[in-house]
Amino acid sequence: MPQLDTSTWSITIMSMIMTLFIVFQLKISKYLYPSNPEPKSMTTLKQRNPWEKKWTKIYSPLSLPQQ
């Protein structure tokens, strides 16, 4: 059975890594970043719910008087 020749593997792997690095650098360099990022204003509008207008009391079964 012939022996597998691995002498060119290191060159192949290194060239593949270099190519991937260059491709990713080119892809990232085309992305436009905002020059002056500013925080978004997080203002929320308070909505009135119908149950906020009236007072309600919730009785739990354990707090009811014994009968």
Curated annotation (Swiss-Prot):
Entry-annotated residues carrying N6-acetyllysine:
54, 57
Q: Which residues form a coiled coil?
A: none
Membrane spanning stretches: 8-24
N6-succinyllysine-modified residues are where?
54
Q: How does it sit in the membrane?
A: Single-pass membrane protein
One GO molecular function term of this record is:
proton transmembrane transporter activity
**Annotated keywords:** Acetylation, ATP synthesis, CF(0), Hydrogen ion transport, Ion transport, Membrane, Mitochondrion, Transmembrane, Transmembrane helix, Transport
Q: Name one GO cellular component term.
A: mitochondrial membrane
Q: Which domain of life is it from?
A: Eukaryota
- Asked if the record carries the keyword Zinc, the reply is no
Keyword Transport carried by entry = yes
The cellular location(s) given in this protein's UniProt record come to: Mitochondrion membrane
Q: Which GO terms describe its biological process?
A: proton motive force-driven ATP synthesis
Oligomer status and interactors: Component of the ATP synthase complex composed at least of ATP5F1A/subunit alpha, ATP5F1B/subunit beta, ATP5MC1/subunit c (homooctomer), MT-ATP6/subunit a, MT-ATP8/subunit 8, ATP5ME/subunit e, ATP5MF/subunit f, ATP5MG/subunit g, ATP5MK/subunit k, ATP5MJ/subunit j, ATP5F1C/subunit gamma, ATP5F1D/subunit delta, ATP5F1E/subunit epsilon, ATP5PF/subunit F6, ATP5PB/subunit b, ATP5PD/subunit d, ATP5PO/subunit OSCP.
Q: What does this protein do?
A: Subunit 8, of the mitochondrial membrane ATP synthase complex (F(1)F(0) ATP synthase or Complex V) that produces ATP from ADP in the presence of a proton gradient across the membrane which is generated by electron transport complexes of the respiratory chain. ATP synthase complex consist of a soluble F(1) head domain - the catalytic core - and a membrane F(1) domain - the membrane proton channel. These two domains are linked by a central stalk rotating inside the F(1) region and a stationary peripheral stalk.
> What protein family does this chain belong to?
Belongs to the ATPase protein 8 family.
Name under which the protein is recorded: ATP synthase F(0) complex subunit 8
In its UniProt entry, the species of origin is given as Felis catus (Cat)
Organism lineage string: Eukaryota, Metazoa, Chordata, Craniata, Vertebrata
Gene that this polypeptide is encoded by: MT-ATP8
